[in-house]
From Swiss-Prot:
Similarity annotation: Belongs to the SH3RF family.
Gene Ontology CC, one term: cytosol
Subcellular location, record wording: Cytoplasm, Perinuclear region; Cell projection, Lamellipodium; Golgi apparatus, trans-Golgi network
Naturally occurring in which organism (per UniProt): Xenopus laevis
Domain of life: Eukaryota
Function: Has E3 ubiquitin-protein ligase activity. In the absence of an external substrate, it can catalyze self-ubiquitination. Acts as a scaffold protein that contributes to the effective activation of the JNK signaling pathway. Plays an essential role in the anterior neural development.
Catalytic activity as recorded in UniProt: S-ubiquitinyl-[E2 ubiquitin-conjugating enzyme]-L-cysteine + [acceptor protein]-L-lysine = [E2 ubiquitin-conjugating enzyme]-L-cysteine + N(6)-ubiquitinyl-[acceptor protein]-L-lysine
Protein name as annotated: E3 ubiquitin-protein ligase SH3RF1
Length: 826
């Protein structure tokens, strides 16, 4: 409180003039000026308290003075003299001494009451400088000033603080002179008051439907808003001019006072335990805000582009620019339910690339296919093999992606994750403000982190040297990696892929590394669709799928997995395999059943084998030694016979697969989606392209030379030569073994999983497309999204459940994702 306001309170209740040291206090403890009390006695012949009418029996001169009032006035009078130049009380340039001169140079007598009107005017003059009620500091040293504009003072002077320039400089005033001075030259007696909670607009925020959004507070960029309170996780209430409304937190930058207010008003339902984040409570904030705002405006989440900017400015997070406000009003309310389901996600989940290209046609002879993501391969190389938790309720509409930290990040809030450079993260939600929500594949913790600190991990060409490590990485993730066998003693090569180096090593024990050399696994287009479902299955569901697949395989010839030899394979091996597959398989132990189902399975049932292989628990690794010793077999003894009987058998299988497709779809979709059963998995827009590619591959299969092995790297075909003599030399007894024998040193890899086709390019899609016009421009938040400009025409291929569309932009021919609320059908 400044001095003028304080002196306004020290006034007589009768005459409303300022009290001085001559004021008297009555026995009832009410204080009045002496002049008023004398006037009452002279007119009434008695003295009663004007406030409570209590009779006073003594005279006015006998009444005591108010000690507290005297001390207060004394302090106001004496304080300015310490800041002066040593006793210059009569200096007229010092307004502070002019006000203090009311009670100086003489006793406090009744004659001064005649000057009360003049004193009252002086009391309401500009604030006294240096009084304790004002922010002030005491000079510890003499400061002469080094530049024009600096404030000069001597040791012991009292300086009134006006504002703080930064942590090292203040702007203050002394004796009517303003200037700057360093902080370390003074001692703060009373600090500056906290600034009001305000925020600065980073983007324009406009509302289209003023009737529906009447409680929103529109503003322009660089506007200064006064923050009133926090409404929920994503919205705050503020004032601009004479208007009060709510606005998105991600559109503004708060000052220090507003940050504290936002933190204090944080929703009480926010979890502080591991795996929690502010984004996972949008369901609670929705209930709280229904009375004030449309439900959709409260949730800034979608399955691909979401928002966790609730305290973005509080911690100075670096977020991506979003100019149109429709991003918030058009977000999907059902995303909150999906987020709550994903809060229990562990360190293991199927990984997908941001924008994987289409797979080329299956080659005649491909190397061993090992399911291991780049993050899992790194874990396996450190010999960290532990139990892998399963994700039973992960839906295909929210496929997680693997990212790698390219910069370190220290968390500033409880719901944030620490990023270490090179650490792998599984991202299952991406926010509209550029923040990601995911889980660390190293610590299994769940939280949010800045998206510009990580980069997507693409598929890599890698080899796992020990068989046990290869099995461990096979169950960690479902990203397809192709392993190229190399002869013994080959040097170690490192292949840089997207800034991350993965070691490509070869075995030194004379056995082809990490699997069966050159085994060829073919899948039909139907099975590729089923792979999406099988990749999400739990262990028990995978076991049931394996048993079902084994039961179905006895009615159809098996020609999917066949060995490759250096010479042209004999055609007589095919009937032998077909005859063997007609027999009912005997009961096997759990590991043997998985391997039998993975190796002896027909084309339509390959997805079931993929589910079984990709969902193998750690218990299968422990039982590895038992079935190795019981089998007593070594080497790869499967041969592939590319001949007319094989092609005719494959054509027959395609017909049979169409009949049983619906049954398998219902079986797998019912087992993998308990919460939301559906009759078929989501339709892949690239299914027709892949089917065409696989049919073309069957026609071109015989034209490929035996020494040329196409290798799939990041979804593209690349030539790679393999020395068939060295491959066959590593397994000298290969030609003499039966087709059903297994190598006790070779782990069985699951079939390749179809890439995330919902994010791939759909340039050859033959389905009818709908034409949409862009209403509001949309800046892309990731590589998988399209940049929309107002007036653009988009051909929509697919509409997703979360409100996002997939289509091709007519302007540049690019294909990607975009929010459906930004376009209208034409």
């Amino acid at each position: 409180m400044d001095e003028s306001a304080l002196l306004d309170l020290l006034e007589c209740p009768v005459c409303l003039e300022r009290l001085d040291a001559s004021a008297k206090v009555l026995p009832c403890q009410h204080t009045f000026c002496k002049r008023c009390l004398l006037g009452i006695v002279s007119s009434r012949k008695e003295l009663r308290c004007p406030e409570c009418r209590t009779l006073v029996e003594c005279g006015v001169d006998e009444l005591p003075s108010n000690i507290l009032l005297v001390r207060l006035l004394d302090g106001i009078r004496q304080r300015p003299r310490k800041a002066g130049d040593g006793g210059s009380a009569g200096n007229s340039t010092n307004a502070l001494r002019a006000q203090g001169s009311v009670t100086t140079n003489g006793g406090l007598n009744d004659a001064q009451n005649t000057q009360s009107g003049q004193q009252r005017i002086q009391a309401r003059s500009p604030p006294v400088r240096g009084v304790p009620q004002l922010p002030c500091a005491k000079a510890l040293y003499n400061y002469e000033g080094k530049e024009p504009g600096d404030l000069k003072f001597n040791k012991g002077d009292i300086i009134v603080l006006r504002r703080q320039v930064d942590e090292n400089w203040y702007h203050g005033e002394i004796n009517g002179i303003h200037g700057f001075f360093p902080t370390n030259f003074v001692q703060i007696i009373k600090p500056l008051p906290q600034p009001p909670p305000q925020c600065k607009a980073l983007y324009d925020f406009e509302v289209k439907d003023k009737e529906a959004d009447k409680d929103c507070l529109p503003f322009l960029k660089d506007d200064i808003l006064t923050v009133i309170r926090r409404v929920d996780e994503n919205w705050a209430e503020g004032m601009l001019g004479d208007k009060i409304g709510i606005f998105p937190i991600s559109y503004v930058e708060f000052n220090s006072a507003a940050k504290q207010l936002i933190e204090l008003d944080k929703p009480s339902g926010a979890d502080t335990g591991e795996g929690s984040s502010g984004t996972s409570h949008s369901g609670n904030s929705q209930k709280q805000a229904d009375a004030k705002k449309n439900t959709k405006k409260r949730h800034s989440f979608t399955s691909l582009t979401m928002s966790n900017k609730s305290s973005q400015s509080v911690q100075n997070r670096h977020s991506m620019e979003i100019s149109p406000p429709v991003l918030i009003s058009s977000s999907n309310p059902t995303a909150a339910a999906r987020i709550s389901e994903l809060t229990g996600l562990s360190c293991s989940a199927p990984s997908q690339d941001m924008n994987p290209p289409l797979l080329p046609p299956p080659p005649m002879a491909t190397p061993v296919i090992t399911s291991a993501s780049s993050g899992a391969a790194a874990v396996a190389q450190r010999n960290i093999i532990g139990p892998v938790e399963q994700v039973p309720h992960l839906r295909t509409s929210a496929r997680p992606s693997v990212f790698i930290a390219i910069y370190p990040y220290i968390p500033r809030k409880e719901d944030e994750l620490e990023l270490r450079k090179g650490e792998m993260f599984l991202v299952f939600e991406r926010c509209q403000d550029g923040w990601f929500k995911g889980t660390s594949m190293h610590t299994s913790k769940i939280g949010v982190f800045p998206g510009n600190y990580v980069a997507p991990v693409t598929r890599a060409l890698t080899t796992a040297t020990p068989a046990k490590v290869a099995m461990a990485t096979a169950t960690t993730s479902n990203v397809v990696n192709l392993v190229t066998p190399t002869p013994p003693g080959a040097p170690c090569q490192k292949l840089p892929v997207s800034g991350v180096e993965f070691a490509k090593t070869s075995s030194t024990n004379g056995v082809s590394p990490a699997g069966v050399p050159g085994c060829h696994i073919q899948t039909s287009p139907q099975s590729k669709v089923l792979l999406h479902m099988s990749g999400q299955m739990t262990v028990n569901q995978a076991r049931n799928a394996v048993r079902t697949a084994a039961a179905h395989s006895q009615d159809r010839p098996t020609a999917a997995v066949t060995p490759i030899q250096a010479q042209t394979p004999a055609a007589s091996a095919l009937p032998q395999q077909a005859a063997a597959s007609q027999q009912v398989p005997p009961p096997l132990s759990a590991p043997a059943a998985y391997i039998n189902a993975a190796m002896n399975i027909s084309r339509p049932s390959v997805p079931a084998a993929s589910a079984a292989s990709s969902a193998l628990p750690t218990a299968a690794f422990e039982a590895e030694s038992s079935w190795k010793s019981s089998s007593g077999l070594s080497g790869c003894s499967f041969s592939e016979n590319v001949s007319a009987p094989l092609n005719s058998a494959a054509n027959k299988q395609d017909k049979d697969s169409k009949k049983e497709k619906k049954g398998l779809l219902k079986l797998l979709s019912g087992a993998s989606t308990k919460r939301k059963p559906r009759s078929s998995p989501p339709h892949s827009p690239t299914q027709e392209v892949e089917q065409t590619n696989s049919e073309a591959a069957a026609a071109l299969e015989g034209a490929v030379g035996p020494d040329i092995v196409p290798v799939i790297v990041n979804g593209r075909a690349a030539p790679c030569t393999v020395d068939c003599d060295s491959v066959s030399a590593s397994t000298p007894a290969q030609d003499n073994r039966k087709p059903a024998s297994l190598d006790n040193n070779i782990p069985i890899a699951p079939p390749p999983r179809q890439p995330c086709s919902s994010l791939g390019s759909v340039l050859n899609d033959s389905r009818p497309c709908e034409r949409y016009r862009v209403m509001v421009s949309y800046p892309p938040q990731s590589e998988a999204e399209l940049e929309l400009k107002e007036g653009d025409i988009v051909f929509v291929h697919k509409k997703r459940e979360d409100g996002w569309f997939k289509g091709t932009l007519q302007r540049n021919g690019k294909t990607g994702l975009f929010p459906g609320s930004f376009v209208e059908n034409i």
